[in-house]
C-alpha cells in the first residue's frame, strides 16, 4: 500500500508540474499495484483532463464514480471532460449530479452557470452564480461570471460592482481589468 501511495502522490506532484507523461506512468504503476483503490483513477482523470485527453479522463472518472459516487468534484471533472468534447447534455447532467451530491459546493453551480452562460441562458446562469456566491461569498469566479451575465444583459452598474468585488478578492486577476 505504501508503494501505491508513493506512486500516486508522485504522479499528482508531476501532474502539478505539467509533467503529464511521467505522471500518467506513475498512475499506471499505482493502479497496477492496487486496481481496487478509487483514488488513483480520480487523480489520473484530472491529469488526463489537464492534458486534454478527455475520453480517457471520462473513463477514469467512470471507474472512480463506480466506487465512490458521493464526490461532487468527480462529477464536475467528468462534466468538464464532456463539455470539452462538445457533449453539453452529458456535461449538464454531470453538473446537476454534482450539485445533488453536494449542495454546498459552489463549483457545481458555477460550472452549470458557465454552461448556461455559454448557451446565452442568462436567467439560469445568473441564478447558478448567485447560488455559488451564497455557498461561498469569497468564490471570485462566480462574481466574475455573474458580471459577464450583467454585461450581456445590459446591466453595466451591476457588472462593475461584481468586477470590483473580484478585484477586492484578488487584485492580481488581470481578466477583471480587461473586461
Model-derived regions, located:
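Alpha-helical tetratricopeptide repeat
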Residues: 1-179
Amino acid at each position: 500500500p505504501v508503494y501505491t501511495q508513493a506512486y500516486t502522490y508522485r504522479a499528482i506532484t508531476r501532474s502539478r508540474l505539467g509533467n503529464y507523461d511521467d505522471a500518467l506512468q506513475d498512475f499506471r504503476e499505482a493502479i497496477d499495484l492496487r486496481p481496487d483503490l478509487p483514488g488513483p483513477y480520480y487523480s489520473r482523470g484530472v491529469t488526463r483532463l489537464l492534458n486534454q485527453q478527455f475520453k480517457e479522463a471520462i473513463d477514469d472518472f467512470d471507474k472512480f464514480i463506480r466506487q465512490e459516487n458521493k464526490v461532487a468534484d468527480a462529477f464536475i471533472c467528468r462534466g468538464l471532460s464532456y463539455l470539452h468534447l462538445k457533449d453539453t447534455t452529458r456535461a449538464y447532467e454531470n453538473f446537476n449530479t454534482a450539485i445533488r451530491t453536494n449542495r454546498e459546493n459552489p463549483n457545481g453551480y458555477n460550472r452549470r452557470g458557465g454552461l448556461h452562460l455559454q448557451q446565452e441562458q442568462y436567467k439560469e446562469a445568473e441564478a447558478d452564480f448567485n447560488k455559488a456566491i451564497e455557498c461561498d461569498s469569497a468564490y471570485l469566479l462566480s462574481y466574475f461570471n455573474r458580471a459577464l451575465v450583467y454585461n450581456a444583459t445590459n446591466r453595466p452598474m451591476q457588472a462593475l460592482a461584481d468586477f470590483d468585488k473580484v478585484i477586492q478578492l484578488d487584485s492580481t486577476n488581470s481578466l477583471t481589468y480587461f473586461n
